[in-house]
Amino acid sequence: HITSKDYIADTLKLQQRFSRDLVLDFGGGIGTHALANAMSSKVEHVFFVDINETNRNFVEYRAKKLGVEKKLTFCKTIKDTQISKFDTIVCLDVLEHLADPASQINNFNEIMDSNSIALFNWYFYKGEENEYPFHVDDIKVVEKYCY
């Protein structure tokens, strides 16, 4: 992600503008966006959901170092958060790794209300020479997701 610094900066600015109240950070990796949201006065609490325990532990360590650990909860699944509706959902660079991204979007819809904000992106492309081998780019999956 070193080559992605401008992109990361842009997504941080975007979430700074729109994130508020109860935030779900889904698949947040090393936690840059979750930690930035935790530092925002507009955000009440961030629920960092990642299936990777190493990621969760690392972000928890970073949160403690930054003094924002009280504004974050770390969970393996959305259900573990015990929150029925989120005000903001952040899901960046995750959907292209899922076997059924359309189903995940439907799951997000269930935990949003009409005033919720969603910050999503995706990159359904394995690359010219398979540079992104873990990205889904099967045309049937992408068409189901996009249409």
Report the location of each language-model feature.
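A short, conserved alpha-helix within the catalytic core of class I
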Residues: L98-F108
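A conserved beta-strand element that flanks and buttresses the S-adenosyl-L-methionine
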Residues: V90
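Short glycine-rich, flexible loops that bind phosphorylated cofactors or substrates
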Residues: H97-L98, G127
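Conserved N-terminal segment of class I S-adenosyl-L-methionine
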Residues: H1-Q82, N121-W122, E128-Y147
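Conserved beta-strand signature within the Rossmann-like core of class I S-adenosyl-L-methionine
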Residues: N115-Y123
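Conserved helix-to-beta-strand junction in the class I
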Residues: E110-D113
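Hydrophobic adenine-recognition pocket in adenosine-nucleotide-binding enzymes
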Residues: V94
